[in-house]
Amino acid sequence: MAKLLGLTLVGLVLALYKNHRSSYQTRLNAFREVTPVDLPNCTLVKGIEAGAEDLEILPNGLTFFSTGLKYPGIKSFDPSKPGKILLMDLNEKEPAVSELAIMGNTLDMSSFNPHGISTFIDEDNTVYLLVVSHPDSSSTVEVFKFQEEERSLLHLKTITHELLPSINDIAAVGPESFYATNDHYFADPYLRSWEMYLGLSWSNVVYYSPDKVRVVADGFDFANGIGISLDGKYVYIAELLAHKIHVYEKHANWTLTPLKVLSFDTLVDNISVDPVTGDLWVGCHPNGMRIFFYDSENPPGSEVLRIQSILSEDPKVTVVYAENGTVLQGTTVAAVYKGKLLIGTVFHRALCCDL
């Protein structure tokens, strides 16, 4: 009888393991191969060798890159050096990046580990750059003022909160106010790994302001990129491991109401909103297994989607760029400016293409 119970227990454990393993592989799109889609006149951005996980383009063409991310379970080509914020002017004939000096003595630069970024332009044209950072595996939002003439960032404030344990991306709605995605419920790396493997869908979106902090959406399987429509009425949320983008209606009190969901055959990462058309440009991972289990002989590919008329009954989804990893590995973000497409990656290079 004891042997029978033991065998039954082993069988149940193996069955659960098999089911979870199959689900895990499906969520990571483990068996997908990339069908290449090329763009003309693409050049690698000089000076970016350790990733450009997120980027933000200002209306004047100045572009911020967050680079050097160290993230649990993800490859890093420069693990011993702190991250940086880089700047590039897309109006130049041959744009090149330069590191932005960070002014003030309130930020520990040795542990600076930038992830998602977002800008907010005040009524007096002051540019604020909000940066997700992971010092010592924690999560903070660092608030900077961009000093254009000096080509520097003035550190103003560090934001932490118990409802922000594992921030991935942010969408600024004020100098110190934003929506943030938590890609995990837990902050502890061990618990995070089980949360992800079991597909618990406990990640969420938080609205933060100096006066009020609240969870405004939850139930996500790795909430990732977030963006806001040009008219400010809608919030777009990428659910990485469910291969979905959610559209929420934003209300005057900053709460969100679900409106619609789009599904894809790729892992959707950061979302950029076209400043002219309102289209969504999305950096994607066609095969997530190759991101989380890196093999230089079989590297992760890259994919960029353009989503037009997302609020309509029949949105148009176009694969604008796709590549198997020989040029660009692990695309996380894409954004446009005057006929140019910038593509960033989690740990690799960045690419600039003509559209």
UniProtKB/Swiss-Prot annotation:
PTM field: Glycosylated.
Active site: 115
Domain of life according to the entry: Eukaryota
Cofactor (UniProt): Ca(2+)
Keyword vocabulary terms for this entry: Calcium, Disulfide bond, Glycoprotein, HDL, Hydrolase, Metal-binding, Secreted, Signal
GO biological-process terms attached to the record: carboxylic acid catabolic process; cholesterol metabolic process; lactone catabolic process; organophosphate catabolic process; phosphatidylcholine metabolic process; positive regulation of cholesterol efflux; response to fatty acid; response to fluoride
Binding site for Ca(2+) 2: 54, 117, 169
Location in or out of the cell: Secreted, Extracellular space
Binding site for Ca(2+) 1: 53, 168, 224, 269-270
Enzyme class: hydrolase
GO CC terms of this entry: extracellular space; high-density lipoprotein particle; spherical high-density lipoprotein particle
Keyword Disulfide bond: yes
EC number: 3.1.1.2, 3.1.1.81, 3.1.8.1
Function: Hydrolyzes the toxic metabolites of a variety of organophosphorus insecticides. Capable of hydrolyzing a broad spectrum of organophosphate substrates and lactones, and a number of aromatic carboxylic acid esters. Mediates an enzymatic protection of low density lipoproteins against oxidative modification.
Family to which the UniProt record says this protein belongs: Belongs to the paraoxonase family.
Protein name: Serum paraoxonase/arylesterase 1
Organism: Rattus norvegicus
